[in-house]
């Protein structure tokens, strides 16, 4: 099973395309929608829905993946639910760059302080990071610096922030999912 979390642009047709692409490596892809506007509510909702999806699945190695803001949530929710994560161009600091776009960006900072201390150290090796060299939203060299000591980082030379096409990374994702 692959759980897919959309980014800030939840209505983008690209989300459906990504789900279809993910079905090439696992027919059981679950799209979980969330508001993107209310971080604390989103965290509760995502924890509940991801936990429910894991319980309903008989997959011994489910993964969660997301793009942008969905990558932020995938890393945290996946860690808290004990499943591996694949994150594309994650938004590591929505508390800094979502001001004016969501109601309470400061809630992300609150979530970060309440999350398990040094969670990346405890999550080491359980997340695959795929970054675009041409991300027009975030400086992915900083993202790589923040994550490379904990996770494998793969660079993509073609895609932009929204990562419209993920098919070139599907076999890497499949191997990561199946490798204990």
Curated annotation (Swiss-Prot):
Protein name listed in UniProt: UPF0227 protein VV1_2072
The family this protein is said to belong to: Belongs to the UPF0227 family.
A Pfam family assignment: UPF0227
Biological source species: Vibrio vulnificus (strain CMCP6)
């Amino acid at each position: 099973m692959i759980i897919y979390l959309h980014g800030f642009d939840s209505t983008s047709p690209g989300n459906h395309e990504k789900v279809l692409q993910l079905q090439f490596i696992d027919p059981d892809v679950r799209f979980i929608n969330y508001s993107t506007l209310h971080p604390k509510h989103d965290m509760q909702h995502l924890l509940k829905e991801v936990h429910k999806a894991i319980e309903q699945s008989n997959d011994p190695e489910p993964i969660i993946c997301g793009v942008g803001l969905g990558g932020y949530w995938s890393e945290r929710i996946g860690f808290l639910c004990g499943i591996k994560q694949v994150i594309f161009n994650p938004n590591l600091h929505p508390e800094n760059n979502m001001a004016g776009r969501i109601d309470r960006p400061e809630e992300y900072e609150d979530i970060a302080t309440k999350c398990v201390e040094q969670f990346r150290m405890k999550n080491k090796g359980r997340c695959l990071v795929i970054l675009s060299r041409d991300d027009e939203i975030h400086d992915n060299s900083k993202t790589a610096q923040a994550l490379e000591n904990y996770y494998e980082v793969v660079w993509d030379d073609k895609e932009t922030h929204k990562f419209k096409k993920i098919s070139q990374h599907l076999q890497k994702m499949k191997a990561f999912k199946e490798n204990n």
